[in-house]
Amino acid sequence: MKEPSATAGTYDIEEVRRKYIGFETATAKGRYPVEHDAIRRHCHKVDDNNPLFLDSEYAKTMAQGAVLCPPSGWLALYFASLGPWPAVFEPLFPIVPTPGKRIVNMSQEVEWSARIRVGDHLSVRRRIADVFQKAVSLDPQAVWIVAEAIITNQRDEEVCVIRNTMLTHRTPEEQGQGARSKEPG
């Protein structure tokens, strides 16, 4: 299949949709298991004093039986990723061709399906859920990308899906409007 083109005047959103929607990366296992100290530091930073996240003795007496990870998509992604060192570039999604290269993160939502416990070993796979064109005042040919990070535990049970909606747009110069906007008025 020919690679979709994103050059001015030749962008084919339907071709891009056919090629990229449903694209999924291989599952990547996180470098480290879920650790209590990282959870504790996060809770102190955000002033979350829930004993299920902080007190291992208390957590043992509860139905969960262990300290839980707070429902934070970023914490889940941290534990499912390659960790802080050595630094490894992990793109949030495959590079979808678009007419513009400017990116705005429009929204993020997390859908939880299971609890994350200290000691769990998380993994992540990423997929493109949707690509569509929707005009905005910045660019009538803006492209929207919905990318998902699917987090699973060591039993391959899905614990959450982190869904990011991003808008890509062209600059006024890329749209051919740069000359008009610079005219004295």
Predicted segments, located by residue:
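HotDog/MaoC-like acyl-thioester-processing domains
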Residues: 1-24, 107, 111-185
